[in-house]
Amino acid sequence: LFMEKKRVYTFGNGKAEGKADMRELLGGKGANLAEMNLIGVPVPPGFTITTEVCTEYYDLGKDKVVELLREDVEKAIANIENLMNSKFGDVENPLLVSVRSGARASMPGMMDTILNLGLNDEVVEGLTRKTGRPRFAWDSYRRFVQMYGDVVLGMKPVNKDDIDPFEAIIEEVKEAKGVKPVSSTHLTLPTICS
C-alpha cells in the first residue's frame, strides 16, 4: 500500500505530472509551478513532494518516509540534472536547488525556504570558476549556510528582541574590518573569507 502511492511529481521543460487543480495534493505552490510549465511559462525544472507525505511523516516517522521517498527523489534530481546539464554536488558544473515549503492554503511569510542547496566548501570553488564571480559564489554559500542554520538547525532568534546569531557574526566581522557603512554589499571577498 505505502509503496504504490505517487509521492513525487516532477515539472520542467514544458512538461508536468501535476496541474493547477491538484492544489490539495501538491499544495498551492506545487500546483502552480506545474501549471506554469504546462502553459509555457519559463520555470526552472523541479519536483513537488505531495502534501500527503507530511501526514505520513507524522504517522510513520522520518526514517520510514525517507525510505519511501529516496528512489523517487533521486530520479527527480536526475531529471533536473539532465534538463539543466549540471550535476548536484559536482565541483565543475554544480546544480544548485531551492527547497521551498508549501501548503494547501496560502500562508505568506509562514513557510521556510532554503536556497543554494548543493553548495559546500568544494562546490563553492567550482561555482567561482564557472561564473568568474567569486563574491557571488561566496555570498551564495553564506546565504545557504545562514538559511540552513535557521530553518534546519533552528539557529534563529526566538523573539523580536533576540539577536540573529548569523547577523551578529556578520556585524562583528564588518566592524572588525572597518566596513562602513555597515552593509554586506560593501564587504570584499577577502573580508568575507578571512
Language-model segments: which ranges?
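Nucleotide/phosphate-binding sheet-loop regions of phosphoryl- and nucleotidyl-transfer enzymes
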Residues: 2-187, 194
